[in-house]
Amino acid sequence: MAIGLKEKYKTTVTQSLKDEFQYKNVHEVPRFTKITINRGLGEASQNAKALESSIQELTLITGQKPIVTKAKKSIAGFKIREEVPIGIVVHLRKDKMYSFLEKLINLTLPRIRDFRGISPRSFDGKGNYNLGLREQLIFPEIDYDNIDQIRGLDISIVTTAKTDQEGLALLKKLGMPFRES
């Protein structure tokens, strides 16, 4: 599964981007560095089961066990204390990254209700793309009967692109379904 997207990048996308942006060297062509999947869990401080179920879901989705993020300092307004779990994060690189990206493009995004494409405006100015999903049910690994609550997650696709236009071209050529705006 991961071989398809990685091979497509190496064979067709690299040469296409090199011609489009007039790069002198193949190593100048933008590539993927990592994909970060993050889920904030505000209720994890009161509900340990929410943390465990989220860890299990993200492990199923990514194939890698997430890291538990903890609060750096206490904030009374948010009712959190220092070192209390407040979220989970997974960093995907190399083959797992390409496998997840292929699954996201071909299986997951088309399962979103009334899906017309993702926004091309979610770039950060340096060629990295951020995507927020409202529910985990769109992933094929998640069974509807086994979830306790619908939770969203954030996906950051980090590239070596210098500008948003380069990042957009890279993702479009790999088949990311962007909305026409």
UniProtKB/Swiss-Prot annotation:
Mind telling me which GO cellular component terms the entry cites?
chloroplast; ribonucleoprotein complex; ribosome
Q: Which compartments is it annotated to reside in?
A: Plastid, Chloroplast
Kindly list the biological process annotations in GO that this record carries.
translation
InterPro entries, alphabetically? Ribosomal_uL5 (IPR002132), Ribosomal_uL5_bac-type (IPR020930), Ribosomal_uL5_C (IPR031309), Ribosomal_uL5_CS (IPR020929), Ribosomal_uL5_dom_sf (IPR022803), Ribosomal_uL5_N (IPR031310)
**Listed GO molecular functions?**
rRNA binding; structural constituent of ribosome
Keyword Nucleus carried by entry: no
Disulphide-bridged cysteine pairs: none
Q: What is its main location?
A: plastid
Which SUPFAM superfamilies does its entry note? RL5-like
Mitochondrion as a keyword? Answer: no
- Tell me which UniProt keywords the record has, alphabetically: Chloroplast, Plastid, Ribonucleoprotein, Ribosomal protein, RNA-binding, rRNA-binding
Q: Which family does it belong to?
A: Belongs to the universal ribosomal protein uL5 family.
Subunit structure as annotated in this protein's UniProt entry: Part of the 50S ribosomal subunit; contacts the 5S rRNA.
Record's function text: Binds 5S rRNA, forms part of the central protuberance of the 50S subunit.
* Name of the protein this chain belongs to: Large ribosomal subunit protein uL5c
User: Where does this protein come from, organism-wise?
Assistant: Pyropia yezoensis (Susabi-nori)
Q: What is the lineage of its organism?
A: Eukaryota, Rhodophyta, Bangiophyceae, Bangiales, Bangiaceae
